[in-house]
Amino acid sequence: MNKIRKTFQYGKHEVTFETGEMARQATGAVVVRMGDTVLLVSVVAKKEAEEGRDFFPLTINYQEKTYAAGKIPGGYFKREGRPTEKETLTSRLIDRPLRPLFPKGFTNEVQVIATVLSVDSKVPTDIPAILGASAAIGLSGIPFNGSLGAARVGYRGGEYLLNPSLDELKDSALDLVVAGTRDAVLMVESEAQELPESVMLGAVLHGHQAMQVAIQAIAEFIQEAGGAKWEWEPPTVNTALEKWVVEKSEAPLKKAYQIQEKTARQAQIQAIRDQLLADRAAEREGEENAVNEHELAVIFHELERRIVREQILTGQPRIDGRDSKTVRPITVKVGVLPRSHGSALFTRGETQALVVTTLGTERDAQSIDDLDGDRQEEFIFHYNFPPFCVGEVGFMSGPKRREIGHGRLAKRAVVPVVPTLDKFPYVIRVVSEILESNGSSSMASVCGSSLALMDAGVPTKAPVAGIAMGLIKENDKYAVLSDILGDEDHLGDMDFKVAGTSNGVTALQMDIKIEGITKEIMEQALDQAKEGRLHILSIMNKVLDKPRSQVSDLAPQYVTMKINPEKIRDVIGKGGVVIREITEATNCAIDISDDGTIKIAAHTTEEGEAAKRRIEELTAEVELGKVYEGTVVKITDFGAFVQILPNTQGLVHISQIAQERVENVRDYLEEGQVIRVKVIEIDRQGRVRLSMKQID
């Protein structure tokens, strides 16, 4: 294969695609370079699909190699291990816009691997990873509907920033990633500082417009490489079987989709499906391959999809009887767990989240070591989705990709209102336990986490709520749905999640399965989402509208103090012996910063104050003219040395012991004796002179 190279300007970065030199046995492979960030993106697809498979087995693996940043992995094995949270999230970010571009009915196994070979701190890796995946799939010849582009958009000083660096993002009120084709936006992932809906929509459109140069470059690159397209035809529809399924199942399915309770509805649909299989087997008894269950299931699912969509587009009530704008009934409880620092139970229809906030010390912060550098995460968010929440039996293991993704979305939504460590001295962990799920569990987690944080006394800027929107679109007819059910998400054309305060949006996530989503439709979805969000906030605020005035008595009690940085060594002691003795004696955790700031975390206020007193004694400065009570530690011919502070001794000269003349110091003093002395001089070297006779 000849080496092909394509270079184009993308904002302030030069982007280069290369193929034909690396990974030549892959179905398609591209080396993409953006600044000094370099990735190898490969795609391999199996030529034959597994018979009877009713899903598309697409696997995306994004992996970071530490050598890309000139680092050696930590740990005993000194090699990369299981995927980090960032790798999992980036894999999902690549997957979401790619998946809808594969044709319906294509079930061949496809694996995309994006490997970071070199990293530039000014160029985040996710955008070149998406561009590289699009180019590699295009080169492979796999059935794929169009080139995919992606852009990151920031917002600062009223202007949009295209593909900002990590440093620029620190000052940006927005971090938004948008991906799409020439004509359609397919995916949005964002975090914002309470921005108006108009700014969010403008960012999406700005990014989509900017990515056109990348889409064009990818198309030209693929054309220049000239790879052969796969010969693939979508599976033919058995029209006779389709007609038979419609005749048998349409009427009972329409009735089933009027059952509002999820479990009962699912049971009825399963009964209809089972009866359909039994009827088909009875009619074709004795025939070879009488029942093709896979073919029957595909047709049955399409019938379900058509029934639900027609119902909504013709203005009929939704599955659970609501109109397009109504939010399901909401109940809110806070302080539901007696020994937690903060808790909330948020229920919306058949979706329920128990969210718990725990406050810890700086030592509880999560250490992150990735290509972006070492850092500490002071706000931790975990989302758990056990199988019982959907009435299923399942294997309990570590968090799956979906749980990590939903947890990150909920975290993005509340981070803008959570105080930083310098304003609130606690490390915060929020855990959302999904107890029931029928759509929008991540947004229930947002609402519950806002309540749990306030219940714990965390001084958040404002309450946050989230809502999931959906879309049903056929030709020019469409309906935007508020607070979608799981079935509406599965059978609809868009999943559009918006979270924010009453002032603006803090997180926006969008996944679109079709083309033709116009600016007007997105505007309507955002406006309708705002209406729903404010409604949810009004219900939440009736229960708890602001943070508790103080943290729970069960949380660590913080005492903060400041000392002279030169005294830090006195507090720590040789080999840490002094600070260890204080922590053991007072049962406290003590953190000391280089600037002399000391944070004492105690189980009770009394323990914290005891530790503070010990430190004050260790670091106290000797005051001229002040009287101290000290212990005689050494006697000499010319006087006595007295310890007046834990790390400070002074000399009582023989002439300062008594009013009369003293011939022998030992006639007046002995070692270990406690006496009162006055500081009469501190010389330039810090030496202290004391007097007994000058005390009034």
Curated annotation (Swiss-Prot):
One of its GO terms (molecular function) is magnesium ion binding. The keyword Magnesium applies. Its main location: cytoplasm. Its cofactor is Mg(2+). Keywords: Cytoplasm, Magnesium, Metal-binding, Nucleotidyltransferase, RNA-binding, Transferase. Residues 556-615 form the KH domain. GO terms for cellular component: cytosol. Gene3D superfamilies: GHMP Kinase, N-terminal domain, K Homology domain, type 1, Nucleic acid-binding proteins. It comes from the Bacteria. Its EC number is 2.7.7.8. Pfam families: KH_1, PNPase, RNase_PH, RNase_PH_C, S1. It is found in: Cytoplasm. PROSITE patterns: KH_TYPE_1, S1. Residues 625-693 form the S1 motif domain. Belongs to the polyribonucleotide nucleotidyltransferase family. Involved in mRNA degradation. Catalyzes the phosphorolysis of single-stranded polyribonucleotides processively in the 3'- to 5'-direction. This is Polyribonucleotide nucleotidyltransferase. It comes from Coxiella burnetii (strain CbuG_Q212) (Coxiella burnetii (strain Q212)). The gene is pnp.
